[in-house]
């Protein structure tokens, strides 16, 4: 199962961003301390559906004994081979999970297991040549980009792109088309109705991932009430992402962590106090390359397949020409402590603190990047920081629980491949996130009716791979409301509402946000086909003075009803409505509600 956890992570977990996290729980034969499944169990399933969906799963688990010791096991496997609604898209994946539990003594037990996941599919960049008419009516501007593949190898190299100067910085408020060369114009221009399944996916696009995970936990219970847990964790992954329009990347990384958690509790007539403290060490090793220079989205005509008119020679295939290439590692040493205090009166106080130190080194190998030269570029640095969180709540006699939470967390700001770019050392790879939240929640009608209301503000930093010198800091303000009602043993109703606004503080400070400019960004250009063969770029903040992040609806509403017929069948229906929202940072194109 997967837990979606909102808010700050416990300091015991390690350095993390404020916005929440996913917690993966492997299936286990253990149902409590010293307790296992009563008998072996298992299941098989086959799922089919539209677009040739095929998923087969099998699982088996149960109790046993090894050398007279209680033992439990659970193994799960899944294989999928499915097509997709989108053209040129399919999914092939294999998942194997295994979990084992064993009581060595009445005080010492072990839990270990792992997961292997292999995925083959593709990335979907959606539509290109986007206009408001395309969004509203499906009307697409057709036409061919002019040929650039002068050596006839079937792909456009960086040098063939550079020869025509198709990446042009302009001011969208004043540009009238005079800055664009003739080579940027489409030929055989027309219009067509575009299907929603026709996207930028090319037949030879690749998104491949292979992940291996292993964990080994030892739990010891002392005579004086302490729980001592040693947790070992290892994960490695390889990723390859190739897109014909001009983006590719690879990641090869692994992480090893060992953490010891000491926990105890004290109970009196009026107070239950729980305490934990934990030292940890975490080592990350990475090799990663991104290839996004000469990324031309609009050259391909989506009414046909990708051809030599739009297909770029990718760095992952050529073996060089990356925009950035990083090889390195970092070591994170941490110490954390937290307490959870609950008084009989209903008052609860949770406090946590953490200290982290990070040593990082990164190298860009000579000859690997497009403009980096033949010499290695090396950087190293050390950083440290504190994290803390505090939450206070009060459970009233009528079931209402008002609460306030505040937190600040220091974390490593890494790329998608756990990589740290040489250009971000020092100063750009370690930062803090902040959160302040308050709200009220409660249960009524014998806990059959639950609701929660929260109002929050958070600030966090994200890495921007295409602007590696400056990481973007965002401020999020929002309100969330949820209610769930178990009406009876057959009917469950739920409703949700969210209000959120995400502001790019980096853009507010600079009044600048780099981006690609599209058809609706130019008030003085009536025919965007004159530049669809290239990429105009510049400041997309020209009409977004409040620096609101695109693609996030301000208001979202949802209703769900589930009915169990008590004969092995159940039905559910959901209705979701979201506000209209800008598709890009400039707000030139609006996606409907």
For each feature predicted by the language model, list its residue ranges.
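Outer-membrane beta-barrel domain signature, strongest for Gram-negative TonB-dependent receptors
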Residues: 94-283, 450
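Solvent-exposed loop segments that connect transmembrane elements
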Residues: 124-198, 295-321, 360-382, 414-426, ...
């Amino acid at each position: 199962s997967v837990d979606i956890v909102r808010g700050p992570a416990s300091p015991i977990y390690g350095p993390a961003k404020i916005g929440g996290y996913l917690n993966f729980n492997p299936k286990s034969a253990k149902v409590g301390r010293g307790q296992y499944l009563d008998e072996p169990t298992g299941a098989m399933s086959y799922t089919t559906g539209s677009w040739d969906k095929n998923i087969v799963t099998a699982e088996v688990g149960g109790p046993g004994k090894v050398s007279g010791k209680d033992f439990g096991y659970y193994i799960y496997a899944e294989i999928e081979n499915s097509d997709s609604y989108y053209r040129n898209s399919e999914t092939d994946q294999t998942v194997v999970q295994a979990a084992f539990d064993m009581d060595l003594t009445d005080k010492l037990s072990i839990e270990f297991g792992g997961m292997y996941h292999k995925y083959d599919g593709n990335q979907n960049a959606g539509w290109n040549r986007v206009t408001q008419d395309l969004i509203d009516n499906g009307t697409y501007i057709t036409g061919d980009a002019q040929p650039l593949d002068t050596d006839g190898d079937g792909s456009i190299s960086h040098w063939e792109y550079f020869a025509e100067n198709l990446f042009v910085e302009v001011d969208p408020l004043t540009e009238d088309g005079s800055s664009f060369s003739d080579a940027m114009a489409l030929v055989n221009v027309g219009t067509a109705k575009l299907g929603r399944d026709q996207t930028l996916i090319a037949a030879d696009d690749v998104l491949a991932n292979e992940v291996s995970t292993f964990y080994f936990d030892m739990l010891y219970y002392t005579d004086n009430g302490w729980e001592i847990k040693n947790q070992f964790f290892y994960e490695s992954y390889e990723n390859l992402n190739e897109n014909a329009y001009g983006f590719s990347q690879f990641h090869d990384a692994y992480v090893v962590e060992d953490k010891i958690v000491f926990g105890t509790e004290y109970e009196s007539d009026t107070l239950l106090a729980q305490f934990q403290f934990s030292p940890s060490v975490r080592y990350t090793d990475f090799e990663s390359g991104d290839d996004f220079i000469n990324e031309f989205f609009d050259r391909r005509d989506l009414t046909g397949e990708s051809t030599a008119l739009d297909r770029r020679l990718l760095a992952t295939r050529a073996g060089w020409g990356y925009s950035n290439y990083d090889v390195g590692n970092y070591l994170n040493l941490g110490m954390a402590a937290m307490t959870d205090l609950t008084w009989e009166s209903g008052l609860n106080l949770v406090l946590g603190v953490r200290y982290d130190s990070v040593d990082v080194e990164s190298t860009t190998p000579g000859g690997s990047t497009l403009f980096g030269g033949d010499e290695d570029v090396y950087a190293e640095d050390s950083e440290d920081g504190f994290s803390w969180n505090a939450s206070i709540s009060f459970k009233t006699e009528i079931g209402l629980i008002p609460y306030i939470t505040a937190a600040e967390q220091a974390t490593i700001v890494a790329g998608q491949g756990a990589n740290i770019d040489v250009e971000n050392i020092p100063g750009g790879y370690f930062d803090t996130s902040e959160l302040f939240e308050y709200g009220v929640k409660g249960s009524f009608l014998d806990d059959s009716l639950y609701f929660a209301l929260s109002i929050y503000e958070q600030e966090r930093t994200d890495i921007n791979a295409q602007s590696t010198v400056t990481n973007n800091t965002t401020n999020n303000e929002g309100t969330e409301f949820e209610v769930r009602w178990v009406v009876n043993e057959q009917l469950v109703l739920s409703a949700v509402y969210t209000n959120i606004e995400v502001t790019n503080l980096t853009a507010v400070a600079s009044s600048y946000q780099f981006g690609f400019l599209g058809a609706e960004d130019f008030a003085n250009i009536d025919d965007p086909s004159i530049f669809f063969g290239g990429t105009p770029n510049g400041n997309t903040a020209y009409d977004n003075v409040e620096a609101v992040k695109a693609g996030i609806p301000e208001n979202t509403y949802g209703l769900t009803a589930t009915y169990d017929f008590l004969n092995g069948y159940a039905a559910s229906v959901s209705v979701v409505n979201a506000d209209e929202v800008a598709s890009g940072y400039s707000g030139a194109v609006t996606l409907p509600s």
